[in-house]
Amino acid sequence: YPTMIAGSSAGSTIGAMYAASLDPDWMENRFKDLISGGKLAALGDMQVAGERESSSIWGQVAQFFKDRVEIILAMNKLGLMDSKKIREIIEFLLPVKTFAELQIPMIITATDVQTGQAVLHDSGDLVEAVVQSSTVPGIFTPAKKDDMYLVDGGAAMPLPVPALQGKVDYILALDISKTGLNKLDRYNMYSIITRAETIRGMHYTRTLADQADFVIHPDVGDTHWSRFDLFDQLIKTGRQAAEQQIDLLKADLSRRKG
């Protein structure tokens, strides 16, 4: 078993489940129970839709004004959904409530949108730490703590390698960031800005991955984070990536020990 785990965003949930249970089979079944139980229905369809186009001029005008109303509403809201919805999901997935109950020490990252700094949690309320690290900006309302507004740990540290540096002898990074980009169907201001931000994030994640001793990076393509319907396929993809790398990982560990 690893001597310490660090997790950001989805990695905080997976890491906490493993650190608590040490049982990958239980984790997989727990997620299947979550999906089949309908708890994810509360999140709705969070996939980012492409550009909408109406065949009529009046439809285009109506969409023009609708988009501007949405922009005005967004300027006055912290998120589309209250973070209590994701808290319910995290509470269902985690078998323990505090860091002290974990079988492996863990560090969970969140991001303070006031300062842009990563906030590291390693004690106290485990559920709250995972909720903060999983709070997708704009989708869920951020957590308020003192003067901080805390959101997804992946914003400041998508791959929390720095959180483990100096604390362990060997860092194995599990990178589930996009491995490719789909061709843009339409070129417009929104799609170009979004694509540029995606590219920036991909390159920053690679920079963090370069700081690890070994990296396993499953080929998830351009899969959106909300594609829960692809659960079985993504599990298979992750397992195949690990199996393909396991001999190289063992050889690297042996070389360093020798």
Q: Model-flagged regions — what are they?
A:
Residues 1-8, 16-258:
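Patatin-like phospholipase
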